[in-house]
Regions:
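A general structural signal marking secondary-structure boundaries and capping sites
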Residues: 26, 68, 130, 144-147, ...
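Conserved alpha-helical substructure of the radical SAM core
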Residues: 1-110
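Radical SAM enzyme [4Fe-4S]-AdoMet core and its adjacent flexible, acidic
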Residues: 31, 105-106, 110, 114-271, ...
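Short, glycine/serine-rich, charged loops/turns that create anion-binding
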Residues: 64, 92, 118, 163, ...
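Short, solvent-exposed turn/loop segments enriched in Gly/Ser/Thr/Pro and often Arg
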Residues: 62, 192, 325
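Flexible mid-to-C-terminal extensions adjoining Fe-S/redox cofactors in radical SAM and related proteins
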Residues: 1-5, 25, 29, 262-347
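Conserved residues at the C-terminal ends of beta-strands
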Residues: 25, 60, 114, 189, ...
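Short beta-strand segments
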Residues: 8-10, 58, 88, 159-160, ...
């Protein structure tokens, strides 16, 4: 059996933006008795490194940098063990060159800043905070300046959630990120149902109106835009990836169930293989082979549990293989890489 490629670790559930695609910002950050300690998280990383010394640890949460006491021990340990470490941040915490330099010298192997558009109003609207565009762009510029000063080779990326509000401007968006900002890459993540619990004032489930209003409807135009951009900017996008993106949006369009969010019928066929390469560990030390809670989970309590999970989970994998949930389009779990070149992590 191949070892897991990625270990996704939740380190918090709080955020300082108010993204329309996520409800984490509605929660107050609390420390619960069930949460694993920094030391327990370190033990999990150490065991993962024995499973795959060439693996990658992905720091997850809301805005992970809001908990530096948990963030930096992970990046330092990954550097010590020779593991790759990946981190996506919204840019609000990267406010000066000193911090940018620290990210490049002590932080993850690659740094990704969330950026939803080259148009400030579109980014700010989807992120829920006026001025968040300026903070994200400033973070990218600071990181690039620090990289030049340090003569570092740390990749610096932008990542966007693509939806009705921004996909038609993808050409201009690529131009802005690659030629104006001069970041190394623009990663595309496709809008999925809203993360977190959607409840009305009475505490009852409510419709996923943002997903319904903003998931891309015209999958054929989207496909043509992707073809145009990969040729113009020499992106080397894999044709199978572009077809998967078209299939995902075509499925949502045909199902006519976007308003039901995660209760939708799903894609035409399975497009995810998270179960073959990922382990996700939440704040309570509960491990899964994907982010969905509909499949069995495993509590990591002692040394050896992570290894046992990976090698004994074939019955769970068999349950997961036919899964067609909309989250299969996520860059973290999607079966097909965006680019033809095989990278350590999908883009």
């Amino acid at each position: 059996m191949q070892p897991p490629k990625f270990l996704f670790l939740d380190i918090n559930l709080q955020c300082n933006l108010k993204c329309k695609t996520c409800m984490y910002w509605t929660r107050e950050e609390v420390v619960l008795p069930t949460h694993i300690s920094i030391e327990q998280r370190s033990d999990i990383i150490a065991e993962f490194s024995t499973l795959n010394p060439q693996g990658a640890v992905v720091i997850c949460g809301g805005e992970a940098l809001m908990n530096p006491e948990r963030y930096w021990p992970i990046t330092r340990q990954c550097r010590s063990l020779g593991l790759r470490c990946l981190s996506v941040m919204n840019g609000t915490m990267v406010t000066d060159l000193r911090f940018a330099r620290r990210l490049l010298t002590e932080g993850p192997s690659e740094v990704t800043i969330s950026l939803n558009s080259y148009i400030p109003e579109v980014h700010d609207s989807t992120r829920g905070v006026t001025g968040s565009f300026d903070m994200a762009v400033n973070a990218i510029r600071l990181l690039l300046q620090a990289r030049k000063e340090l003569n570092s080779n740390t990749p610096i990326y932008a990542m966007s959630v693509m939806c009705e509000q921004n996909y038609k401007d993808l050409d201009q968006f690529y131009d802005f990120v690659l030629n104006d900002l001069k970041a190394d890459k623009l990663k595309l993540n496709w809008l999925q149902p809203t993360f977190g619990t959607l409840l009305d004032r009475n505490g009852d489930p409510r419709p996923d109106k943002f997903y319904d209003n903003n998931v891309i409807r015209d999958h054929e135009t989207l496909f043509e835009i992707l073809k145009h951009c990969t040729e113009k900017y020499q992106l080397n996008l894999d044709p199978e990836y572009m077809e998967t993106v078209r299939k995902y949006h075509r499925s949502v369009f045909k199902n006519e169930d976007a308003v039901t969010g995660w209760d939708g019928h799903g894609t035409e066929d399975a497009i995810c293989n998270s179960f073959d390469r990922n382990i996700m560990v939440n704040m309570d030390g509960v491990a899964r082979l994907c982010f969905s809670d509909q499949f069995p989970s495993f509590k990591i309590s002692r040394s050896g549990d992570l290894t046992h999970l990976w090698h004994s989970a074939e019955p769970v994998r068999n349950l997961m293989r036919p899964c067609r949930q909309y989250c299969g389009i996520s860059h973290s779990v999607r079966r097909v890489n965006a680019t033809k070149k095989i990278d350590m992590i999908q883009v």
